[in-house]
C-alpha cells in the first residue's frame, strides 16, 4: 500500500477491464454524471469462418500431435453446438473478475447489481459503490495541487 493515495479517473467510460484497473485505486472518480461505469462480466464470442474461407477457395487443414487430444476442444465443441466446456471457462474467468472487484472495493459496495455486466451512469455507480466521487478532471487536479501545495 502506497502512503500516497492512488486515484483512478474515469473519463466518460470505465468499463470491464478498464474499470477493473481503476477499482484497484484507493479512490475512483468519474468525470460527470453521464460517464458510464461497470460492465463487470465476461463473455466469449466465436466466429465460424469456414464457409467464408471455402467461398474464397481456402481449405483449412489442422494437424495435432497425438498427445494433444484436448487442444482447442472447448472451442470446437462450442462451434458444433455444445458450449458447456467454454461456458465453464468463461464462468471461471468471471468468478475471478468479480473476486478482484470485491477485493478492490472492499467495504464500499452497497449491493450486488454490479455483478451482472450492467453499465451504470456515474450517479448510479456512486450509489452502488463502484466509484467514490463525480467531478471534472481539472477540479481533481486543482484539489491535488492544493493538497501538495503546488501552484
What are these regions (language model features)?
Residues 8, 62, 134-135:
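A generic structural-conservation signal
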Residues 26-32, 129-140:
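Short, well-structured beta-strand/strand-turn elements
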Residues 87-112, 122-123, 132-151:
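C-terminal long alpha-helix characteristic of the crotonase
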Residues 65-71, 115-118, 138-143:
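Short linear loop/turn motifs
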Residues 22, 125-126:
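Hydrophobic residues within well-ordered alpha-helices
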Residues 1-4, 13-104, 147:
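Small-residue-centered hinge/linker elements
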Residues 9-15, 114-118:
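Glycine-rich beta-to-alpha transition loops that act as phosphate-gripper elements at the mouths
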